[in-house]
């Protein structure tokens, strides 16, 4: 999970404009790949975003899919977000092996004042120029962050994979993180604080108003079921 600077606002919201990716990681929770070209409906997203109460938004993220190979499709969605809202982008870092892609991607990130978060599992690192990224992180001094290696959870393609344990660590109950919500290309909005299942909270055709209450209701029901299940063991 990406860590964001806490400002007292309760929601970190993200948009996944596409699941198109130049990698096919065995553990991808969103089943991203070079063949997955499904994209988010811009008009419906624009209507939904126009109803946001921006006082509730701590930070706004973009990922998917790999943003660096599809910036022209991400661009219209980025432009929907008010300039004063902190933004971050999560990338697999493959752009670092090409001078041309590096320049294009970093210029795009600078244009939108993105905090850049680079995935750092062994499966990502082998497709990166890691030394370059480490030096760049020092040079940009906080603007680019190399993630700690993610713990692989039983979601997406990792579900049922040998060595991946399906468990619940009740991370939904942590008080040091905001509510994390992500809009997927199919229009579903999922709760992303969980290490197990990403519950669908609503769609982008529903109202933004009440999204926190709906999230808390779904999470509370799941938490109660987990506690009751543990007590029966």
Task: Give the location of each predicted region.
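Catalytic cores of phosphodiester-bond-cleaving enzymes
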Residues: 1, 31, 204-206
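Conserved glycine-rich "GG(E/T)P / GGGxP" loop and the immediately following alpha-helix
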Residues: 12-18, 23-150
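Short, compositionally biased leader-like segments
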Residues: 143-163
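N-terminal [4Fe-4S]-dependent radical SAM core
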Residues: 1-14, 54, 168-170, 178
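Accessory C-terminal segments flanking Radical SAM cores
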Residues: 157-233
């Amino acid at each position: 999970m990406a860590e964001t600077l806490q400002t007292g606002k309760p929601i970190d919201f993200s948009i996944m404009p596409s699941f198109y990716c130049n990698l096919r990681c065995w553990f991808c929770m969103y089943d991203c790949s070079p063949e997955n070209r499904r994209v988010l409906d811009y008009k419906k997203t624009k209507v939904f975003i126009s109803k946001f109460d921006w006082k509730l938004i701590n930070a706004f993220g973009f990922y998917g899919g790999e943003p660096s190979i599809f910036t022209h499709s991400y661009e219209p969605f980025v432009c929907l977000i008010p300039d004063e809202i902190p933004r971050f982008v999560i990338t697999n870092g493959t752009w670092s092996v090409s001078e041309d892609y590096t320049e294009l991607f970093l210029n795009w990130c600078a244009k939108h004042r993105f905090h850049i978060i680079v995935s750092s599992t062994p499966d990502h690192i082998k497709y990166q120029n890691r030394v370059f990224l480490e030096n760049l992180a020092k040079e940009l001094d906080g603007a680019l962050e190399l993630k700690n290696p993610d713990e692989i959870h039983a979601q997406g393609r990792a579900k049922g994979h040998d060595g991946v344990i399906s468990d619940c660590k009740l991370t939904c109950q942590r008080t040091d993180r905001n509510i994390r919500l992500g809009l997927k290309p199919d229009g579903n909005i999922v709760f992303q604080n969980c290490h197990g299942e990403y519950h669908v909270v609503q769609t982008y055709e529903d109202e933004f108003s009440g999204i926190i209450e709906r999230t808390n209701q779904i999470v509370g029901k799941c938490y109660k079921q987990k506690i009751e299940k543990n007590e029966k063991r």
